[in-house]
Amino acid sequence: MVKLFIGNLPREATEQEIRSLFEQYGKVLECDIIKNYGFVHIEDKTAAEDAIRNLHHYKLHGVNINVEASKNKSKTSTKLHVGNISPTCTNKELRAKFEEYGPVIECDIVKDYAFVHMERAEDAVEAIRGLDNTEFQGKRMHVQLSTSRLRTAPGMGDQSGCYRCGKEGHWSKECPVDRSGRVADFTEQYNEQYGAVRTPYTMGYGDSLYYNNAYGALDAYYKRCRAARSYEAVAAAAASAYNYAEQTLSQLPQVQNTAMASHLTSTSLDPYDRHLLPTSGAAAAAAAAAAAAVTAASSSYYGRDRSPLRRATGPVPTVGEGYGYGHESELSQGSSAARNSLYDMARYEREQYADRARYSAF
């Protein structure tokens, strides 16, 4: 019995149709269709060879089918990477394209690239040679051997190869190369795991240069900075003040009056000459004269009566008239006299402007 593989089967194909097609060359013992491929068991080897010779690339429902002798699935199938695939391409169309060169175990499209697993390595090489850099559905696709491998669960399988560095003899979880591609250092990890003694942290700040107990280094540093900054600030301020004085003097207008110019340029004036203050006798005389002038002015000013409450005194009514208007007038006259005595005696006993002469003399 010979087992034949039929690939790239159309969707319309049925088992009865395939069976009748292969029975033309010999007795068919079994026929199975799995998705877009199938298997046919023929009793005679010669009949199987005739079926392969006549039915390979046979057009069935408008699709060319592939017929060849079936082989057991290889443990290490050849994986191809197919790049630059058209977005309208489907798995079925891509699989049919690669089945022209041999049996395809798996075909998966991921975005604009795909992975095709071919059963035999020689078929994969032929597919690369025939399909690489060729037009397929309006785009030029690129076919090459895939460098990625099927990853098993961590710790499962044999130590045949690491997925990080590609070397054999260890799993990826034990690989000395981390995910970024650098060689990892497991010394600290093992020390933490097995309780190695680490260098203790200092309790105080004595070991640090800028944080010692006395803060001596930091204090001296800031003192030097403050001294330098203060000296620079004073020097800058002095220079700016000197420049401002020069600019101000240069911007003063020229003296137009000749008399004033001669007066200013006269050598008889001493800029450092000081005049003596007046003596005590002269100051007292000036103060007395000023006080007399102020007294005369204030007496004439404050002598007038401007109060609206002060009225001319009229005849005082008798007591028999009761508490009428006359009694209220009597009370108002008494209160006005009391107010007049207060104004004349307490407030104007001392002149307010008598002390001004003492200051105006200077």
UniProtKB/Swiss-Prot annotation:
Q: Name one GO biological process term.
A: circadian regulation of gene expression
Query: What is the role of the protein in this entry?
Result: RNA-binding factor involved in multiple aspects of cellular processes like alternative splicing of pre-mRNA and translation regulation. Modulates alternative 5'-splice site and exon selection. Acts as a muscle cell differentiation-promoting factor. Activates exon skipping of the PTB pre-mRNA during muscle cell differentiation. Antagonizes the activity of the splicing factor PTBP1 to modulate muscle cell-specific exon selection of alpha tropomyosin. Binds to intronic pyrimidine-rich sequence of the TPM1 and MAPT pre-mRNAs.
InterPro entries tied to this protein: Euk_RNA-bind_prot (IPR050502), Nucleotide-bd_a/b_plait_sf (IPR012677), RBD_domain_sf (IPR035979), RBM4_RRM1 (IPR034897), RBM4_RRM2 (IPR034898), RRM_dom (IPR000504), Znf_CCHC (IPR001878)
**Residues annotated with Phosphoserine modification:** 86, 307
Report which gene this protein is encoded by: RBM4
Could you give a GO molecular-function term held by this entry? miRNA binding
Choose one Gene Ontology CC annotation of this protein and give it.
Answer: nucleoplasm
Organism the protein comes from = Bos taurus
Q: Which intervals hold the zinc fingers (CCHC-type)?
A: 160-177
Q: What is its main location?
A: nucleus
Does the keyword Cytoplasm feature in the UniProt annotation? Answer: yes
| Record's protein name | RNA-binding protein 4
Q: Where is this region: Interaction with TNPO3?
A: 196-362
Domain (RRM) spans 2-72, 78-148
Q: Name one Pfam family in it.
A: RRM_1
Chain intervals for the UniProt region annotation (Disordered):
306-336
